[in-house]
Amino acid sequence: MLLTIDVGNTHTVLGLFDGEEIVEHWRISTDARRTADELAVLLQGLMGMHPLLGMELGDGIEGIAICATVPSVLHELREVTRRYYGDVPAVLVEPGVKTGVPILMDNPKEVGADRIINAVAAVELYGGPAIVVDFGTATTFDAVSPRGEYTGGVIAPGIEISVEALGVKGAQLRKIELARPRSVIGKNTVEAMQSGIVYGFAGQVDGVVARMKKELAADPDDVTVIATGGLAPMVLGESSVIDEHEPWLTLIGLRLVYERNVSRA
């Protein structure tokens, strides 16, 4: 099986693929202080819970694909693959890795690996033109041309960042639970804040996507808009522009990049 690891700023998502099918997944907190040994222990605990894998670290794993937005974690995971997975082929997404998607940016090396991986999956699953909206620590909007090229995007503060900022900077406000309010017009402070977050972000998505579509394609209706990320469900029901929801888009992209970089016997 293929182990895929997507390290974000807040959470790390892991997925196990049996062929093209994702058969297991986990979400854990990202901690830049974890060493390679600590990560190995964590992986062994997760892997040991799966009935198709052995209790020893590496049993049943035939390949590994990793992307990370936290450089220190990527370094430690590199050590994990080297020390604990032996001869198992590993692909770490960094400059030089074949993705199959041209990156039309001023400095391609500065684009987050997860954003490129999302574009890879979007091209494979839906074709271009497309826009990927990833609801993570930041909310990112990434554009794929009709020819399957990554052409750039938008980075905005994420939902959790906005909630925390309201609680920290607002003298009479506090951190709230992320939940849909009963109505747009809040009847108390918590509901009013929840409404601002949910409907404010839905409006942001609709507005940004509408502008991106005009730049991306002659006919905006040709553009497929894909939502992904852990916080996507908060906005899905309120946005009018999202066509597809694929929660495992990044993991699928990692599988595709692994296959394009590891030759099969």
UniProtKB/Swiss-Prot annotation:
It holds the Pfam family Pan_kinase. A monovalent cation. Ammonium or potassium. Keywords: ATP-binding, Coenzyme A biosynthesis, Cytoplasm, Kinase, Metal-binding, Nucleotide-binding, Potassium, Transferase. K(+) binds at D134. It comes from the Bacteria. Signal peptide: none annotated. It catalyses: (R)-pantothenate + ATP = (R)-4'-phosphopantothenate + ADP + H(+). ATP binds at D6, V7, G8, N9, T10, H11, T12, V13, T137. It is found in: Cytoplasm. Its cofactor is NH4(+); K(+). Its EC number is 2.7.1.33. The active site is at D114. GO terms for cellular component: cytoplasm. Catalyzes the phosphorylation of pantothenate (Pan), the first step in CoA biosynthesis. Belongs to the type III pantothenate kinase family. Homodimer. PANTHER family: TYPE III PANTOTHENATE KINASE. This is Type III pantothenate kinase. The lineage of its organism: Bacteria, Bacillati, Actinomycetota, Actinomycetes, Kitasatosporales.
